[in-house]
């Protein structure tokens, strides 16, 4: 059966893992009434753009590995996180900038190259496929009276098409406006990305929002969906609505997994589903995935007659990415070593949180997905006096400081009477 034929459908239980996602809207049709297939980009990619896409993919799988926890589902937008942090990089300097570039996978690329590629990627993804509803938006919100360097604002406006605004963060209307912007950008799917009461030390929010919606090129028949067991990692099962589809689809398999690529609309966007083989856990797959392995998978699909059984699901997910980014080497930005001297003349700035909220709905008709990432910048007050409260077991050393000679060493686990 060819992919252009109407697939027939039936039901059988199967468990699956969603790994890669893109979505679109109601597909336009050509003279024959069919969706017009998109087979090439509107222009060739430059060498730098290819490097940035490769870097973005490396970051995607690095983030997947650091964020993944055994037996826990997750749904992230690496692109949203990358764009929010990419804006923030324009205010960073020195080792802070170097670490951010490395964590995001950009290697030796210059800031000009990175910014230009973000700009072209925005232009490419939005409107690539007329059947795809894709929205990507960026914004920067600063506290009223906080001095922001003009060069930074120019960079985020030009390269990220960012909306820029100065607000009185002490006014409750400020958080309502920021959250309203995110709500609008994600079609109501992401709410309350910043708290109702903005902390007094916050001076800036840098936000990216992404929204996708679309229909499958080959839709599942809702009447064929039945409740079936989904086999959990611990050996138990839960009942889920299992959709079914049979037809020619991009498929590949090896000794570790099966993969099927489900296209949307004009087939420029797709969702890849990876199913571990028996004896291989989904966490094993996560640990083995990197950009090179992904390229091998993505390049290895062949049109094959496939019987697919996929759970219908909807989930919301929220994660603070601080620890994940630190694990990728981005440490200075979060503490007193942070250098954001290209963002403001005020010193003592650091990132207090990188937070992402996401949402996805996969059903018989297609997929809707949204994510928003916020980078929260704070202004550190005067250094706090260190507190040393010796109220638990401790060590002590008596020494002669000038020569370095140690006279006594001791360990106290329960102080004897004085």
Say what each PLM segment does.
Residues 1-22:
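Sec-dependent bacterial lipoprotein signal peptides
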Residues 16, 24-169, 174, 401, ...:
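Detector for small/aliphatic-rich hydrophobic stretches
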Residues 71, 110-279, 284, 299-382:
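Non-catalytic, conformational "gating/processing" segments within enzyme and secreted inhibitor domains
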Residues 286-290:
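Short, surface-exposed, charged loop/turn segments at secondary-structure junctions
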Residues 291-294, 325:
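C-terminal, non-catalytic macromolecule-binding modules
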């Amino acid at each position: 059966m060819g992919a252009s034929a109407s697939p027939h459908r039936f039901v059988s239980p199967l468990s699956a893992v969603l790994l890669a996602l893109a979505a679109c809207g109601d597909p336009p049709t050509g003279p024959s009434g069919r969706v017009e297939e998109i087979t090439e980009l509107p222009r060739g990619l430059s060498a730098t753009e290819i490097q940035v896409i490769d870097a973005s993919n490396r970051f995607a799988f690095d983030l997947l590995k650091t964020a993944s926890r055994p037996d826990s589902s997750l749904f992230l937008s690496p692109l949203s996180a990358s764009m929010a942090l990419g804006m923030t990089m324009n205010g960073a300097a020195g080792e802070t900038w170097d670490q951010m570039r490395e964590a995001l996978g950009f290697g030796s690329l210059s800031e000009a190259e990175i910014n230009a590629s973000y700009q072209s990627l925005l232009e490419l993804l939005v409107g690539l496929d007329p059947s795809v509803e894709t929205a990507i938006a960026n914004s920067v919100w600063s506290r009223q009276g906080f001095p922001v360097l003009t060069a930074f604002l120019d960079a985020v406006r030009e390269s990220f098409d960012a909306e820029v605004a100065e607000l009185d963060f002490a006014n409750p209307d400020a958080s309502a406006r920021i959250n309203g912007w995110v709500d609008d950008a994600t079609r109501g799917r992401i709410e309350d990305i910043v708290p109702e009461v903005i902390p007094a030390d916050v001076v800036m929010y840098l936000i990216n929002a992404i929204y996708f919606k679309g229909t499958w090129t080959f839709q599942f028949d809702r009447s064929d969906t039945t409740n079936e067991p989904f086999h959990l990692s611990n050996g138990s099962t839960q009942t889920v609505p299992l959709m079914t589809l049979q037809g020619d689809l991009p498929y590949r398999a090896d000794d570790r997994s099966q993969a099927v690529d489900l296209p949307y609309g004009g087939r420029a966007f797709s969702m890849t589903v990876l199913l571990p083989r028996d004896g291989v856990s989904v966490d094993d797959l996560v640990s083995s995935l990197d950009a090179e392995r992904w390229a091998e998978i993505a390049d290895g699909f062949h049109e094959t007659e496939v019987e697919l059984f996929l759970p219908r699901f909807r989930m919301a997910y929220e994660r603070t990415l601080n620890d994940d980014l630190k694990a990728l080497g981005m440490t200075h930005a979060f503490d007193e070593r942070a250098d954001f001297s290209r963002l403001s003349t005020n010193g003592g700035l650091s990132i207090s949180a990188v937070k992402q909220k996401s949402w996805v709905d996969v059903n018989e008709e297609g997929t809707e997905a949204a994510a928003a990432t916020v980078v929260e910048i704070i202004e550190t007050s005067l250094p706090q006096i260190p507190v040393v409260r010796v109220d638990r077991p401790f060590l002590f050393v008596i020494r002669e400081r000038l020569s370095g000679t140690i006279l006594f060493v001791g360990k106290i686990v329960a102080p004897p009477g004085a």
